[in-house]
């Protein structure tokens, strides 16, 4: 009896400590975490933070693909930057479907009354499948162990499939997860809750970049495989925990939706773009995404080839960029909360990005690494201001019954332009490298020309 009582007391202490930790985090967060004031008694901050874990898994995937694997494939595995950029742009194939995914989740009919959760789970499985294929593709590309005699095209095609699955899964999870977050709060709080989700995305990217950098301090192909496999398991675990009991079962709602005549996708899309200012907002998002996004595929190789940074050091660049973006989101939260104009704030973000890229371009010939890091941080701030401003403008311009569709449209334009920008950046870099071999220009010149193109877009 005494042993049982002791066990119960121990269990109770553990439970109380866990509850205390969550409550303490929820009490501290409103003071320091942008958009944390969106929480209410019905939807406490602890619940929103738990839901936001789906953004953490998306951030992990972005860091791994755009940061670590991008540099490893170009520098260590000697894969042409055009091929790597093409692989990173493969999720572009799925990006336009974000609008359709948002529409389907708005109108989805389920026996349990769920709208968003089934799509989040499907996206999670896609991500896991991509991460499951990726290690073996990289083994073939690296010629590691028995893969030394395997045809190189097998590694390239398998890596492309893995990138596509991870990207498609991230698109599905992010679009429907953001829509689920808006379902939980009042309509006037939609921009805040989406902003909170993106803050958690950036925090996830920072933490993931630091962890990946530490794990890959002594890089080997085998260690990279372990990191990817661990990411696959963590992704499934975090997403399951994130969606657990977030969307209530409602059979009455399911029966009601079966009797409602839903508009077709074409009708819904026509209605959305007919809203005043919506097309202008989407065009601005496209230009700004080109301006900030083309550098994603080049920053890590640029740091390695122009400044001699290691794998661990270039992986941490993603953390610095995300930290700058987080600062931008925080400033945007304060200014928009005070009644600032989203479009005016978006212009300020674009203007801040210009000197950031100028600093990156000048870094090899002047101060070197410190100026390079300062430029990355500045572009992160500009991207954060621009991203939150355009996101808020998009949500405010859309009707309340088309939240998923509007978020899908914003994500589709952003992701599509980011994918095209990444592919163009790699292509331009490779073409200029060929010219470099003829004219003997410096190694960082092809990268700098791409950065100047981005300045033009901004």
List each model region and its residues.
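C-terminal transmembrane helical hairpin of 12-TM major facilitator-type secondary transporters
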Residues: 346-390
């Amino acid at each position: 009896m005494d042993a049982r009582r002791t066990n119960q007391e121990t269990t109770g202490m553990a439970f109380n400590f866990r509850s205390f930790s969550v409550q303490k985090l929820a009490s501290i967060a409103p003071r320091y975490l942008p958009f944390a004031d969106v929480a209410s008694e019905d939807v406490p901050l602890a619940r929103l933070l738990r839901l936001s874990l789906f953004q953490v898994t998306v951030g992990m995937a972005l860091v791994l693909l755009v940061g670590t694997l991008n540099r490893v494939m170009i520098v260590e595995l000697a894969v042409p930057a055009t091929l790597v950029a093409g692989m990173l742009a493969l999720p572009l194939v799925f990006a336009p479907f974000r609008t359709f995914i948002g529409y389907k989740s708005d109108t989805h009919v389920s026996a349990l009354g769920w709208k968003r959760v089934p799509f989040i789970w499907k996206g999670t499985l896609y991500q896991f499948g991509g991460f499951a294929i990726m290690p073996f593709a990289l083994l073939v590309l690296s010629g590691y162990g028995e893969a030394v005699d395997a045809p190189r095209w097998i590694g390239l095609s398998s890596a492309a499939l893995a990138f596509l699955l991870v990207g498609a899964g991230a698109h599905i999870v992010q679009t429907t997860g953001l829509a689920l977050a808006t379902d939980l709060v009042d309509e006037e709080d939609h921009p805040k809750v989406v902003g909170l989700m993106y803050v958690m995305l950036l925090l996830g990217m920072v933490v993931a970049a630091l962890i990946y950098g530490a794990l890959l301090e002594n890089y080997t192909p085998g260690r990279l495989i372990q990191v990817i496999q661990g990411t696959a398991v963590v992704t499934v675990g975090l997403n399951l925990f994130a969606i657990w009991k977030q969307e209530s079962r409602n059979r009455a709602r399911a029966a009601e939706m079966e009797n409602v005549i839903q508009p077709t996708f074409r009708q819904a899309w026509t209605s959305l773009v007919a809203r005043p200012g919506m097309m202008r907002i989407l065009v601005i998002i496209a230009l700004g995404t080109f301006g900030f996004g083309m550098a994603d595929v080049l920053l890590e190789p640029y740091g390695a080839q122009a400044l001699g940074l290691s794998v661990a050091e270039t992986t941490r660049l993603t953390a610095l960029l995300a930290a700058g973006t987080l600062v931008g989101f925080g400033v945007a939260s304060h200014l928009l909360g005070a009644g600032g104009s989203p479009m005016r704030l978006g212009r300020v973000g674009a203007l801040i990005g210009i000197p950031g890229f100028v600093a990156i371009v000048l870094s090899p010939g002047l101060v070197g690494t410190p100026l390079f890091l300062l430029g990355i941080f500045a572009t992160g701030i500009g991207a954060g201001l621009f991203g939150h401003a355009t996101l808020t403008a998009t949500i405010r311009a859309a009707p309340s019954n088309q939240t998923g569709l509007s978020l899908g449209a914003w994500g589709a334009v952003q992701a599509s332009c980011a994918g095209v920008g990444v592919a163009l950046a790699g292509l331009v870099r490779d073409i200029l490298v060929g010219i470099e071999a003829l004219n003997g220009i410096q190694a960082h010149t092809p990268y700098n020309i791409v950065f100047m193109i981005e300045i033009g877009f901004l």
